[in-house]
């Protein structure tokens, strides 16, 4: 009897201990949730085989706009024109004398050495004022290669006149510098008197040639175009005048003829 009672007491104590342990133990699902929350969220090598569904693991993509290395388009430069000649023929003596040529006229075909020389004034194209679609371009070559000596008197530019304008003269020529010398004789400037203009061959025209050239120039509008090359060449052979000489004559007489029409 006593042995049985002790056995029952022992079983009762074991049952109570087991009940006490079950009271302090957490439920299975609660433990698993707590364990998942305590897992570290750091990723290795940018990947995680079992990501936490509660956390937003979608990567943020940042895209850069493609960089363009193409050069910006620029407007093509306009056609260059060469206007009045600005060569200083008295630069070596400290004066300022221009020849009065109003526009560059090529002496030869494009691509040749003669194409860079003006048929009217025989100066290089670089001495003429360059103009691109109305823009003024400063040409430093036109101011001469020598500087004005210190202490010299300021001299206003003098223009050498071209003959043959208006059909009054019988030839297309450049006047000498007599007026230039006379204008400075009163100031005692003797250093300019040694300047001598270079001699150029001048073509003389008779009255019949001048009349025919005037009529033909008005017919073609005082300009030569490629469409009229054959007609111009035939006319020049007829009056026995070179094509380039006729071109220079039109250049020198164009403005005077237009003034007469007005």
Curated annotation (Swiss-Prot):
Q: Which residues bind DNA?
A: 198-261
Task: Please provide the record's keywords in A-Z order.
Answer: DNA-binding, Homeobox, Metal-binding, Nucleus, Transcription, Transcription regulation, Zinc, Zinc-finger
Q: Which SUPFAM superfamilies match?
A: Homeodomain-like (SSF46689)
The main location is: nucleus
Q: Where is the composition biased (Basic and acidic residues)?
A: 1-25, 36-47
Subunit field text: Homo- and heterodimer with other ZFHD proteins. Interacts with MIF1 and MIF3; these interactions prevent nuclear localization and DNA-binding to inhibit transcription regulation activity. Binds to ZHD1, ZHD2, ZHD10 and ZHD11.
The free-text domain note is: The homeodomain differs form the typical one by having namely 4 instead of 3 extra amino acids inserted in the loop between helix 1 and helix 2.
Report what the protein is called: Zinc-finger homeodomain protein 6
Question: What is the originating organism of this protein?
Answer: Arabidopsis thaliana
Q: Which gene encodes it?
A: ZHD6
